[in-house]
Amino acid sequence: MWIDCRTIARSIEERTKERVEKLGFTPKLVSVACTDDPSALSYLKSQRKKAEKLGIAFEILNVSPEEIVSTLKKLGSDESVNGVFVARPFPPSFDEKEILSSVPVEKDVEGVNPANLGLLLYDEEIFPPCTAEAAVRILERETNLSGKRVTVVGRSVTVGKPLALMLLKKGRDATVTVCHSRTVNLEEITKNSDIVVVAVGRAHFLKKNMVKEGAIVIDVGINYVDGKLQGDVDPSVEEIARVTPVPGGVGQVTTALLFEHVVRAAERQRK
């Protein structure tokens, strides 16, 4: 069975729009871009459309490699800007850690600055990474996480690692296993899990025989195969488990949360 993520995203957007109206001013998101990646540019276009729908001001700043860090620091002191997003992927020569560390902490609506990531160790979710939070929101709608055996396949800084911390948080209380490319007997681990989250960047990686019947599967994958968007989960898994679709799944909720974070940042800055 496919999980209806669009309804979750719409609910988040409706609440965000209500909060925008109560602010008394128009919050603003600035997306900084130094990439020619087609999928990144497409996402920026979708951000513009979503911002207009929600009543949020939006601007794209196209900068050179030499300007990106200084631009991010300037945005930190610009009182007209409430949220800052950095388009990725970066060119191979870029120092990703330096760039992400330059995103203003109080405007880091995507949750990429190491300072915001570090707060997750203390169960503080001010601006958690949007994709990881999207997975959590979907799971909380589908089930009670307490005591559930969750396997996260993938250990990236933006999804796997922060998601594991968020699932362990007191009040959620999941039992979490993190797997990766060196994990032995992966199928045995996933097959004994109530929930499997896959974020490995390999189309149709998780097969039907790797999942137990009735499990919940969160597909975070974004892969283009013959020009078509495919997830990390094989479509056959849907026959025995509840699965988030690709497209129209986690990505929908991720974008909705990005703009929820913009409003949260605006509310915090107003105080």
From Swiss-Prot:
<dbReference type="InterPro" id="IPR020630">
    <property type="entry name" value="THF_DH/CycHdrlase_cat_dom"/>
</dbReference>
<comment type="subunit">
    <text>Homodimer.</text>
</comment>
<keyword id="KW-0521">NADP</keyword>
<keyword id="KW-0511">Multifunctional enzyme</keyword>
<keyword id="KW-0028">Amino-acid biosynthesis</keyword>
<dbReference type="GO" id="GO:0000105">
    <property type="term" value="P:L-histidine biosynthetic process"/>
</dbReference>
<comment type="function">
    <text>Catalyzes the oxidation of 5,10-methylenetetrahydrofolate to 5,10-methenyltetrahydrofolate and then the hydrolysis of 5,10-methenyltetrahydrofolate to 10-formyltetrahydrofolate.</text>
</comment>
<dbReference type="GO" id="GO:0004477">
    <property type="term" value="F:methenyltetrahydrofolate cyclohydrolase activity"/>
</dbReference>
<comment type="pathway">
    <text>One-carbon metabolism; tetrahydrofolate interconversion.</text>
</comment>
<keyword id="KW-0486">Methionine biosynthesis</keyword>
<dbReference type="GO" id="GO:0009086">
    <property type="term" value="P:methionine biosynthetic process"/>
</dbReference>
<keyword id="KW-0658">Purine biosynthesis</keyword>
<dbReference type="Pfam" id="PF02882">
    <property type="entry name" value="THF_DHG_CYH_C"/>
</dbReference>
<feature type="binding site">
    <location>
        <position position="181"/>
    </location>
    <ligand>
        <name>NADP(+)</name>
    </ligand>
</feature>
<keyword id="KW-0368">Histidine biosynthesis</keyword>
<feature type="binding site">
    <location>
        <begin position="154"/>
        <end position="156"/>
    </location>
    <ligand>
        <name>NADP(+)</name>
    </ligand>
</feature>
<dbReference type="GO" id="GO:0005829">
    <property type="term" value="C:cytosol"/>
</dbReference>
<dbReference type="GO" id="GO:0004488">
    <property type="term" value="F:methylenetetrahydrofolate dehydrogenase (NADP+) activity"/>
</dbReference>
<dbReference type="InterPro" id="IPR000672">
    <property type="entry name" value="THF_DH/CycHdrlase"/>
</dbReference>
<protein>
    <recommendedName>
        <fullName>Bifunctional protein FolD</fullName>
        <ecNumber>1.5.1.5</ecNumber>
        <ecNumber>3.5.4.9</ecNumber>
    </recommendedName>
</protein>
<dbReference type="GO" id="GO:0035999">
    <property type="term" value="P:tetrahydrofolate interconversion"/>
</dbReference>
<dbReference type="InterPro" id="IPR020631">
    <property type="entry name" value="THF_DH/CycHdrlase_NAD-bd_dom"/>
</dbReference>
<keyword id="KW-0378">Hydrolase</keyword>
<comment type="similarity">
    <text>Belongs to the tetrahydrofolate dehydrogenase/cyclohydrolase family.</text>
</comment>
<dbReference type="InterPro" id="IPR046346">
    <property type="entry name" value="Aminoacid_DH-like_N_sf"/>
</dbReference>
<keyword id="KW-0554">One-carbon metabolism</keyword>
<dbReference type="Pfam" id="PF00763">
    <property type="entry name" value="THF_DHG_CYH"/>
</dbReference>
<keyword id="KW-0560">Oxidoreductase</keyword>
<dbReference type="GO" id="GO:0006164">
    <property type="term" value="P:purine nucleotide biosynthetic process"/>
</dbReference>
<feature type="binding site">
    <location>
        <position position="222"/>
    </location>
    <ligand>
        <name>NADP(+)</name>
    </ligand>
</feature>
<dbReference type="InterPro" id="IPR036291">
    <property type="entry name" value="NAD(P)-bd_dom_sf"/>
</dbReference>
